[in-house]
Amino acid sequence: MSKDKKNEDKETLEELKELSEWQKRNQEYLKKKAEEEVALAEEKEKERQARMGEESEKSEDKQDQESETDQEDSESAKEESEEKVASSEADKEKEEPESKEKEEQDKKLAKKATKEKPAKAKIPGIHILRAFTILFPSLLLLIVSAYLLSPYATMKDIRVEGTVQTTADDIRQASGIQDSDYTINLLLDKAKYEKQIKSNYWVESAQLVYQFPTKFTIKVKEYDIVAYYISGENHYPILSSGQLETSSVSLNSLPETYLSVLFNDSEQIKVFVSELAQISPELKAAIQKVELAPSKVTSDLIRLTMNDSDEVLVPLSEMSKKLPYYSKIKPQLSEPSVVDMEAGIYSYTVADKLIMEAEEKAKQEAKEAEKKQEEEQKKQEEESNRNQTNQRSSRR
């Protein structure tokens, strides 16, 4: 019996020795495997760090995502190594087979794959451009529509500059601008409103100027007054356009010196203004009065009375051509004279003119006296003839 026990003890010792050797080999194997896995995890971490260096130019969102995934990978790798060491120790204690460790590794790898998030795809530039071309016009249309529906679309501050003879209200009325008109219409149809303002016969030119946001300035230039048509005590302005104003002005508003016109025919006034515009300002300022003086030969002959009492007879249609010669003749005149430019150019004194007028008047009076004498003689002859006929009839 004792021998059998001894044999059994020997067998158990041998088994224990063999078991300890297997455990040693298993420990060495697991230790090597754990070291290899740690080295593999470190290599992966180095590769990821290198990849992060290459992709550092990418967007911050992507870098954050990659850094998060790298941290998760490193943490998971550390967890794996720790778990593997723990599993090796557990294997030492529990002596579980290698298949169980592989299953755990597969599960952790699957968890790791689920933890990794896919990187966001970058939107191509052409899609951004297409979206911009659609969104920008739509937004602009929305803003314009909202503006047109708001009260600001018709808000206008209109001012008038340059008026002397007219008023700001007259200019606004001539422009045709209404309170309900859109501000944008005034900007787009500036030429139309400027033309309407020029319908006022006082306005020579008009300009509509816009200032942000709602200010409009109408700058006008009026026609000059070149003369005044005089009828009795009333004075009517004649504009540089040839227009005769229908309303008289007060005597207080008259300038110190002005040109008086004693005819009001519209066509003759237009011709006179046109001819007057072609002569020099000095010669123009020397004229005091203009009146019609038609002759048998020249129907449009006019008489210009100068400020120095000289008189010039010149055809209206040739005034701009002939009147400049007066400046050359003037130094030769020693006393107030009449310069006749009807046919040629010659002059005589005002005294001679008065004598000629007196002689002409005497001739006319003599003719009238002769005419009266002839009429009286005819009447006397008729009366004597009547008396003779009456006497003859009474005798019978």
Swiss-Prot record:
Chief location of this protein within or outside the cell: membrane
Keyword Chaperone attached: no
Cytoplasmic-facing ranges: 1-130
InterPro entries assigned to the protein according to its UniProt record, in alphabetical order: DivIB, FtsQ_DivIB, POTRA, POTRA_FtsQ_type
Gene3D superfamilies: 3.40.50.10960, membrane protein fhac
Chain ranges on the Extracellular side, renumbered to this chain: 152-396
Feature: compositional bias, Basic and acidic residues: 37-65, 75-116, 361-385
Name assigned to this protein: Cell division protein DivIB
Organism: Streptococcus pneumoniae (strain ATCC BAA-255 / R6)
Lineage: Bacteria, Bacillati, Bacillota, Bacilli, Lactobacillales
Name of the encoding gene: divIB
